[in-house]
């Protein structure tokens, strides 16, 4: 073997010298001496008669046997009890990062098992600095006992930081399956090859395959002008230095290796001498530019050879390309005989042809489209192969925008656009046209006076240019392609609204006025009356101010007879986007009677591309497509903005699409296409410490708890969903399950799954439990339950015993829940879950979510009073206890605030004293300025979206106000003042949805934004919510208790309609007039409704003007964080309550009628 390796080295060196010459070896180039036929498994045939080198995954029995596929021996695997158990082999130190390997083994079942699930999976376990990963090599290959089955696949090693563990193991979804394995072979896939990585270097095929023009430039293979042969590549339409011919080298280059570049260039128009060079663009976490050669002088009319070289630093690159540029931004030039010679990467990208076609999965719902670049639409490019396999609609990412089609006035260039149309026709695809009008990527000449570019064009001239452009573009495709024209709709106008919902202050608006929008639609309809016409925009899926603005604009346009057929929702979302907001936005806009198309879908990872983030992304993609399917009556297309992560427009690092940078299916693909093959992310929710009472009335303490949402469908796409709140004490896990279900049936029900030790086992252990609760209250007898129906569905109050595990703060309990919905057909039509959307909860706890046992709720107090809103700290604020911002979302130091809260019958008052030594408001975005944001959820529903009662109020240090979402800002008041240490913000927030009273608890949070001297936001800190999503999600707000309204201010004539016959009428009216008790509404007291002993205690303190005191822990059923704890302490010290020795029984009930006596 040593002689063979030496011979191989000599032959490779000789070949390299013949190609490059001896000078190649200064600097030296890497040469591998690996024999690519070497099996990395040293004992893969077991002919040693041992299992040396093999280890156990789990605890199976491994033994050598004479039942063989080759030779005399094989390995027999028995004694399995878990699906993941089997033989394993370590490859740590044997495999190289970035290298691809072929994996093959032979498998046969031990006879006599009669398994109903005889499947084999081969998995690589990998642990690096980013955690533990399970990479599938072969997924559930069927095997038999009748013959040996070859199980084969490929594996490419990738990892982050240090690789700590790497081993391959053979498993089966049948936990007791027994089998033999033999002839295990793992080898590197490809030997080293050296050559030209440019496939179309001479253009003698007469096409531009692999080449594109960057920017506005257009490339074309031309006959009759060539350095050799008959063809060369001509570049025209350049408007910037960097515009020019570009070739994609992604997957073809080995970082760390030198590549020699050689090409010929010629021009015929321009100066006598021009300067030209080649540059490599390599994208990792940012775009890197590597110069191939200095600018070379090229003489007009002469073919000139240009040489250079480059070496990419070792890194992970999502995109690599080489392009030619000139210092003359409009120079047209030819190139020919282009070579980039060096080691050809073994990591050539191939797509997965054995997975479902994406568009076929949704063929009964809507077409699935993708934005493309014409350079990647040659059949040899794996991007084109991926496009053809998975999509049945195309849109041009840039090639149909104004600057691409008409870079100079009257000169239309359709070459790149036509390439996309031709590809669509050849592959039986439809197209969306994008876009006829935009404020970006439109040439300046559109807006300039032709005689003086420093002056603006007139309204009439700009309208004429707009009409000419729209008419020419639509007529081109209609005339050239006729009945074959695949374009079924156009984005007529794009992004005409700004972030605040106003018409964007573009040059179109400035010169023409707001009617430019309707004019564009009129011109398009006139040019092609059969074409569907769309208005397209971003951030209209948030159900906020921009959604409303789009609704109002389209409603107005339709009322004026403008021919608008649909709304394009770009849907550039992120992994924290709210599915309820997206649903509400779709339905709101669709109510206008227009089509809805999702036009630019991707999901920003916000810089986090960890495995956990990718699984979280998968869940949201699944929820999103379930929603799209449920809304299929409105949605007529769903289009992704890019085919794979390597071509995303988003800044790196990012992974926003269904296919990764190597064009392989991501977890999100499987979550959308076949959730049974997905790996769910593990969600986490907090259970707050507390002991709620279970009974006819829902305990008021539940108001303080953030819910989790049971809204991921595993059956159907429309049906019952739920919110779940959790609390705990040393005896029970308490659940409040509120089910939304408008099709009542006794077959409806809840299933609760609990893994007390949270060990995430793949089968049930003795600590694991499944409980059932029917809508009629029947079900598991070993838990406490109370079920009631209401107009929205039904509510279950549950207590699940956990005393046996001695629960403590920060412990975790594995948890999942399933909501079953029978819509009246006698069967379960829809099922939603919280965590495991593979729906394997009945047998597998590994995909349960986590319930974290946490301390009691965060709650602050606002006292009754009416300060003057003047930005000054009046004396009235002196008696208010402050709270502080100390929950960091961005950064870990910077501006912070202490804040105090007061209230009266009209307003909530907030005083924020901000410490900030460097004040800045230069950013155009209000949220990036030095400012204070107050978040209020008046009904404290803690929803993941904003309801009408919710608000986001922002005030910067200069008293400039701004508001988020659908905030009702009417009546809002603020004042600010500068201090030696920063600034003060004082606000009055009007009550719009509730009548406040003593004991009311609202959702509340406060955030401080900190800008640096350049206007960049560098710090965000809140009082409570750590998520950073308070602007769209109220579920993380803290709690604010309203107290202190005096009883002495008499209200005359107080009475209620429902106490006329009550024996306690007189007492109720007297106490209500003194604010000691309050009506449930202005006209209803509800005398028979119960109150808790805690609520009654608070009322008594108000009656006697007794101040609350810090709770000292006298009672076992009162926790220091409970809203009533300090009231209980004051009443206990005053002798008003005694308890029963250990318990105060704060949640025991009395009627509102009884408490007045």
Swiss-Prot record:
Catalysis performed (reactions): Endohydrolysis of (1->4)-beta-D-xylosidic linkages in xylans
Pathway named in the protein's UniProt entry: Glycan degradation; xylan degradation
Keyword Signal: yes
Alphabetical list of InterPro entries matching this protein: Carb-bd_dom_fam9, CenC_carb-bd, Galactose-bd-like_sf, GH10, GH10_AS, GH10_dom, Glyco_hydro_5_CS, Glycoside_hydrolase_SF
Induction: By xylan and xylose.
GH10 domain segment(s): 352-675
CBM-cenC domain segment(s): 38-189, 195-343
GO biological process: xylan catabolic process
EC number: 3.2.1.8
UniProt keyword list: Carbohydrate metabolism, Glycosidase, Hydrolase, Polysaccharide degradation, Repeat, Signal, Xylan degradation
Thermal effects: Optimum temperature is 70 degrees Celsius.
Gene Ontology terms for molecular function: carbohydrate binding; endo-1,4-beta-xylanase activity
Record's signal peptide: 1-33
Catalytic residues as annotated in Swiss-Prot or TrEMBL: 495 (proton donor), 537, 600 (nucleophile)
Any Pfam family: Glyco_hydro_10
Activity-pH dependence: Optimum pH is 5.5.
Domain SLH: from-to ranges: 1051-1114, 1115-1157
Effect of residue 537 to N: Loss of activity
Highest taxon of the lineage: Bacteria
Family: Belongs to the glycosyl hydrolase 10 (cellulase F) family.
Protein purpose: Endo-acting enzyme that randomly cleaves the internal xylosidic linkages of the xylan backbone, yielding xylooligosaccharides of various lengths which are further hydrolyzed to xylose molecules by beta-xylosidase (EC 3.2.1.37). Requires at least three xylose residues for catalytic activity. Does not have activity against xylobiose.
Official protein name in the record: Endo-1,4-beta-xylanase A
Species name: Thermoanaerobacterium saccharolyticum
Organismal lineage: Bacteria, Bacillati, Bacillota, Clostridia, Thermoanaerobacterales
Gene name for this UniProt entry: xynA
